[in-house]
Amino acid sequence: DYYWSQWNSEIMIKQFKEAVALQPDGIAIYGFPGDAAMRPIIKEAREMGIVITTMNTPLPDLEAELKTEGFGYAGADLFAAGFNLGKKAVEVCGLSAGDKAFVWGLASMPNRGERTKGAIAGVEEMGVEVVYQEIPDNVNSDASQGTPMYVATYSANPDIKMAITDHGGLTASLPTYMKAAGHGSEEVCGAGFDLSAPIVDGINSGYIDIVIDQQPFIQGYMPIVQLYLTTKFGMAGLAMDTGAAFVTKANI
């Protein structure tokens, strides 16, 4: 069974409880809600003999405690991925100290927010000023609703030279946002995460200049392998860093 949570932590918790009640052999989860919120449900699941593992966003405390019971992680080192993208994007976009960059992310979320914090730190280390906006719930679940917020941010800060969107859906929507703000493909440098077909189109069209590919297929595939290995052979949790490489128009 598969549950779609719209990237909403409260929905994830509700669906996780529902999944545990079905008593499957194993469950692969996202770590968006954080260790504290997920701990009681995971404890209940383990008492029922259900194997748990994570993908995309880690639960580092629980992973450390339950690794011998099959609790692994398939995903990027989030802070490092954000930090590396932030620095590389400044370089690729040709920004200088004192320039402004817009970072649109999820810094308030436990664990998941580390990627946004990393991106901000990477940009700031290069001497670039950050204008930050938190992605609201409605935009987090439906990137098409982000256009007014993007346009408003640029209206208030017309000297912003780069946008980093810490969200695959928002990164794919950068061309739409930029066109709505009246920007041509060479006016604002676009950066973000993941490598979907729309993002490839955005790179080829010039609206997206650099992304970091986190290999989401691997993030989804390996946790299922993990559950099989643990339920069948009792293997411990595996940790896989999927934050692979930067992608630009030069190597697409």
Description of each model-found segment:
Residues 13-47, 119, 137-202:
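Hydrophobic alpha-helical
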Residues 103, 123-126, 215-252:
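Hinge/cleft segment of the Venus flytrap/periplasmic-binding protein
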Residues 36, 41-80, 196-204, 208:
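Flexible loop/hinge segments that line or gate small-molecule binding clefts
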Residues 1-6, 100-103, 122-143, 243:
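Short beta-strand elements in bilobed, periplasmic/extracellular small-molecule ligand-binding domains
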Residues 12, 72-99, 143-147, 194-199, ...:
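Hydrophobic alpha-helical segments within soluble ligand-binding/sensing domains
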Residues 6-10, 33-36, 58-62, 95, ...:
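Solvent-exposed loop/turn segments at secondary-structure junctions
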Residues 1, 26, 71-73, 99-108:
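Short beta-strand segments enriched in small/hydrophobic residues
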Residues 1, 81-85, 110-130, 145, ...:
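Short, solvent-exposed amphipathic alpha-helices that sit
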